């Protein structure tokens, strides 16, 4: 069984809980998720099975869309409502000031990840240090907030939709917005609406997945990579490429316009994998045949 499941994760489970359940249902050993969702969060969690686990990094590259609910006036150690409340402040900002502060985070920004995260420093996960009461300085990371839409404001609660790059922490975004307003804030609820090509409208709730319907819900690997252009290669080049040879023959190179990643098919429309063109030639970088 090779492909990707568009799972809708319920609140209360970790991403690895979902992986374990899919392993049990599919009876497959190779199963992996494509981007952690906190237990507090629900939403789209693409799960790769079999050979699809080879392309986890490529699936994770896509933009993410979240529906977030933020509570102003409270600060917690985890940046969400499940953590220890460290401070409570009065919210004095007007709705206009709140909107202005939120919208100022659009564009390319630097974000410091929360201590309670799976990021590693010197091989140790940050949340393992945080649980020991250790806080260390974290380097800021460049992220992109493509769009923010305010859904509702009922002070101290604010609901908004965020379209962002991978690696964005909505908990940190809420914390930073609260910091800018001077009252603090924490993430109260979160739903991932989409992740790359995967949307909640076409997802299957984890609790509905079973041995009978898993096959009909699995998506072919190449269909999940439709954001990459495709090329077809003839039999001669196919044999070279699947054996790891970097092909510099101009009869192939001239068919490939740009130095970027492509979906590669043979002439019978069999998906071979992902290939990349460089100055030295064209090569399969992820073989999936």
UniProtKB/Swiss-Prot annotation:
Pfam families: TruB_C_2, TruB_N. GO terms for biological process: mRNA pseudouridine synthesis; tRNA pseudouridine synthesis. Gene3D superfamilies: Pseudouridine synthase. The active site is at 38 (nucleophile). It catalyses: uridine(55) in tRNA = pseudouridine(55) in tRNA. Keywords: Isomerase, tRNA processing. The keyword Kinase does not apply. The keyword tRNA processing applies. Its EC number is 5.4.99.25. One of its GO terms (molecular function) is tRNA pseudouridine(55) synthase activity. Responsible for synthesis of pseudouridine from uracil-55 in the psi GC loop of transfer RNAs. PANTHER family: PSEUDOURIDYLATE SYNTHASE TRUB1, TRNA-PSEUDOURIDINE SYNTHASE. Belongs to the pseudouridine synthase TruB family. Type 1 subfamily. HAMAP family: TruB_bact. NCBIfam families: TruB. This is tRNA pseudouridine synthase B. The gene is truB.
């Amino acid at each position: 069984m090779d492909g990707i499941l568009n799972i809708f994760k319920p609140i209360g489970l970790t991403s690895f809980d979902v992986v374990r359940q899919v392993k049990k249902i599919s009876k497959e050993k190779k199963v992996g998720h494509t981007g952690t969702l906190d237990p507090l969060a629900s939403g789209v969690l693409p799960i790769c099975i079999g050979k699809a686990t080879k392309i986890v990094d490529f699936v994770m590259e896509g933009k993410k869309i979240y529906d977030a609910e933020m509570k102003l006036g409270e600060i917690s150690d985890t940046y969400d409502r499940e953590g220890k409340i460290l401070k409570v402040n009065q919210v004095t900002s007007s709705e206009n000031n709140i909107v202005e502060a939120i919208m100022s985070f659009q564009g390319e920004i630097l974000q410091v990840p929360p201590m309670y995260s799976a990021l590693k420093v010197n091989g140790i996960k940050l949340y393992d240090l945080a649980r020991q009461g250790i806080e260390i300085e974290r380097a800021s990371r460049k992220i992109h907030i493509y769009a923010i839409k305010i859904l509702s404001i009922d002070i101290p609660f604010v609901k908004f939709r965020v379209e962002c790059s991978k690696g964005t922490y909505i908990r940190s975004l809420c914390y930073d917005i609260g910091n800018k307003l001077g009252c603090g804030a924490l993430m109260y609820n979160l739903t991932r609406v989409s992740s790359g090509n995967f949307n909640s409208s076409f997802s299957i709730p984890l609790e509905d997945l079973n041995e009978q319907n898993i096959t009909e819900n699995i998506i072919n690997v190449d269909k999940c990579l439709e954001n990459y252009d495709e090329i077809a290669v003839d039999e001669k080049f196919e044999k070279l490429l699947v054996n790891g040879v970097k092909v510099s023959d101009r009869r192939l190179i001239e068919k490939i316009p740009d130095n970027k990643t492509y979906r590669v098919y043979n002439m019978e429309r069999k998906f071979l994998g992902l290939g990349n063109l460089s100055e030295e030639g064209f090569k399969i970088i992820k073989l999936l045949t």
